[in-house]
Curated annotation (Swiss-Prot):
Belongs to the RimP family. This is Ribosome maturation factor RimP. Gene3D superfamilies: RimP-like superfamily, N-terminal. It is found in: Cytoplasm. InterPro entries: Ribosome_maturation_RimP, RimP_C, RimP_C_sf, RimP_N, RimP_N_sf. The keyword Methyltransferase does not apply. Keywords: Cytoplasm, Ribosome biogenesis. Its main location: cytoplasm. Pfam families: RimP_N (PF02576). The keyword Ion transport does not apply. Required for maturation of 30S ribosomal subunits. Coiled coil: none annotated. GO terms for cellular component: cytosol. It comes from Rippkaea orientalis (strain PCC 8801 / RF-1).
Length: 153
């Protein structure tokens, strides 16, 4: 059954996407998570959907959702596109995609794992920080092989 807020969210997200030459292809509201996760999938029917497209829609939709108070409380907003699996490299990307689901792969096992999945919290000169099911994890940068968006979450 579709969550009752989905039609309202689609009505708010569609003009934002269309203003950028994009379309909303799916909206999922995961109320079983704390805070709830609102995922809006977008695509560019004329070509590839870029991370910049996702970032622009995320910033604009977040402002509209907060202003309209349709969400009624705290939530996590994720904007994604089928097929985005790009690695994050620049400080700008790490700032832009804070809160997004990522996969961090290490060169050697760190705390018995070579792959970490969680929500990106940030990066500094010493570590990449993720939130994994409410637990904060700092992964030393010198061990990291790559950080990429998790397209399956």
């Amino acid at each position: 059954m579709t969550h009752p807020l989905i039609p309202q969210i689609i009505n708010l997200a569609t003009p934002i996407a269309e203003d950028r030459g994009l379309e909303v292809v799916d909206v999922v509201f995961q109320t079983n998570k704390r805070p709830p996760v609102l995922r809006v999938d977008i695509r560019n029917s004329q070509g590839e959907t870029s991370l910049d497209d996702c970032e622009a829609v995320s910033r604009a939709l977040e402002a509209v959702l907060d202003e309209s108070q349709v969400m009624g409380g705290s939530y996590v907003l994720e904007i994604s596109s089928p097929g985005i699996s790009r690695q994050l490299h620049s400080d700008r990307e790490f700032i832009s995609f804070k809160g997004f689901a990522v996969i961090v792969t290490t060169e050697i096992p760190y705390l018995d794992h070579k792959e970490w999945r969680g929500q990106l919290q940030g990066r500094d000169e010493s570590a990449v920080y993720i939130n994994q099911k409410g637990r904060a994890i700092a992964i030393p940068r010198e061990l990291i092989a790559k950080v990429q968006l998790d397209e399956h979450r």
